[in-house]
């Protein structure tokens, strides 16, 4: 039945949901890549859709910006609508010279300055990691598509406008591939409620060089990332 934030019924969502931050990007993904699409959520404008990809039922829904927002939607999808796998498909900022604009990054793990996982893990450090099989399937899908994807640690920041830019130097030293705002929270929610999760990002801006993509491009042109996510779902079904 409907929750305070999702006006859908059990069965409206597939067991796998792709989740961009922007609900308009969710709409674009559904209309571009899925067939037999129907809208399954529109509460607060957080659009959700279900359709099929090569005959496989898949859903896509926005999760908003930041860990608090994405945690609400992912928790409700898992506990109230039976979702088993969540793939965040979003953007990130690069801090390393060898990571370029529009590179695809697969978040094997997610560091964070947020305290949410310490709250759920009795004030201990929780290793926020993606599901191994989902990572492997995404890597295999990228190779099959001829897309060079980077795999490693990303950083989920609570603040978009950071007061301490020297932290980017630390991130670079520790090999962080990209900075975003949600993955660590999604991985924590998935672990808490027995689901699986993965984050795939496209580099939308470079924090060092100040290169950036436009908002319109972020909404519509990060197609390699979406294809990797969708094809990885099909590979997962073969296991």
Curated annotation (Swiss-Prot):
The active site is at residue 205. InterPro entries: DeoD-type, Nucleoside_phosphorylase_CS, Nucleoside_phosphorylase_d, Nucleoside_phosphorylase_sf. Phosphate binds at residues 21, 25, 44, 88-91. A purine D-ribonucleoside binds at residues 5, 180-182, 204-205. Its EC number is 2.4.2.1. The keyword Glycosyltransferase applies. One of its GO terms (molecular function) is purine-nucleoside phosphorylase activity. It is an enzyme of class 2 (transferase). CDD domains: PNP_EcPNPI-like. It catalyses: a purine D-ribonucleoside + phosphate = a purine nucleobase + alpha-D-ribose 1-phosphate; a purine 2'-deoxy-D-ribonucleoside + phosphate = a purine nucleobase + 2-deoxy-alpha-D-ribose 1-phosphate. The keyword Magnesium does not apply. Keywords: Glycosyltransferase, Transferase. Coiled coil: none annotated. GO terms for cellular component: cytosol. GO terms for biological process: purine nucleoside catabolic process. PROSITE patterns: PNP_UDP_1 (PS01232). The record marks 218 as: Important for catalytic activity. Catalyzes the reversible phosphorolytic breakdown of the N-glycosidic bond in the beta-(deoxy)ribonucleoside molecules, with the formation of the corresponding free purine bases and pentose-1-phosphate. Belongs to the PNP/UDP phosphorylase family. Homohexamer; trimer of homodimers. This is Purine nucleoside phosphorylase DeoD-type. It comes from Cronobacter sakazakii (strain ATCC BAA-894). The lineage of its organism: Bacteria, Pseudomonadati, Pseudomonadota, Gammaproteobacteria, Enterobacterales. The gene is deoD.
